[in-house]
């Protein structure tokens, strides 16, 4: 595989993890990986064959693991060096020495401070791997910040991945009424233990994840290849309808991409769209009022992220018509543009 060394997520491998259904039933499950969805970005996504009859979890399902070690795009975006076993050894010692717990507390305190200064930067943390390129920036910042070690990087990533996992689980809970139709069914949450010598707790090493209904189909980006031209308009409109439905249920998706829609044949000569990937979402209750919510809806433009992109891609095969709700947002927030 093209991933970092010792990646366990390869076709044919068998993995073991704890499973908890939305109804609260729990069991230990073993699953065989039968397909890997590459490249890994924020999470490691694989198709597994489940055989957990005690919970009724049998057959092919999607397992999405929030594993910091193999979050290759996230590491690249955050300028964090690729994972190695040597880094893991350093991280384990950091955990045993109590450094990880202290660092997570520090991160949360800084995050709370950033939340209070809501108009400041989002609190993205600078990593010093490219130290020469960051000299000017560091001169302008508080000089008390220390260079992060590899163990600190891993602690930050673990904490960040846990937040992404919690967000995605909460989104699925909030969208329960459209599970199995417009989004996959959330079948269970999972936890995979990563033991190490001297370990007393898995708080900083265990890998959380979710088990999802497998939707067999093709990404919206490939609609030209798999669907007849006369169906493109309806398929793209269905994707936009799902965006509106999710918005109506109080979700703001900061990562709407056309590849995050799966299209499958529903009935003869018809297609159904399903949306996936909700780790980078916000919730209505996170915003002060309707004005604040609408402003960020306008900035994010979830509808346009599909409509404009697919209109350009399909070159006349799909005509995007701005919806009334987004025309209203444009009128209110984009007058100056």
Where on the chain are the PLM-derived regions?
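Conserved beta-strand elements of beta-rich interaction domains across eukaryotes
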Residues: 52-53, 68-70, 191, 216-217, ...
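Conserved hydrophobic "DFG−1" position in protein kinase catalytic cores
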Residues: 47-50, 214, 263
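ATP-binding glycine-rich phosphate-binding loop
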Residues: 2-76, 81-88, 92-93
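Residues on conserved beta-strands of the protein kinase catalytic domain
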Residues: 59, 205-208, 272
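Long acidic, serine-enriched intrinsically disordered low-complexity regions
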Residues: 115-143
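C-lobe/activation-segment region of protein kinase-like
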Residues: 228-238, 247-253, 259, 263-337
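Conserved structural core of kinase catalytic domains
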Residues: 74-115, 139-235
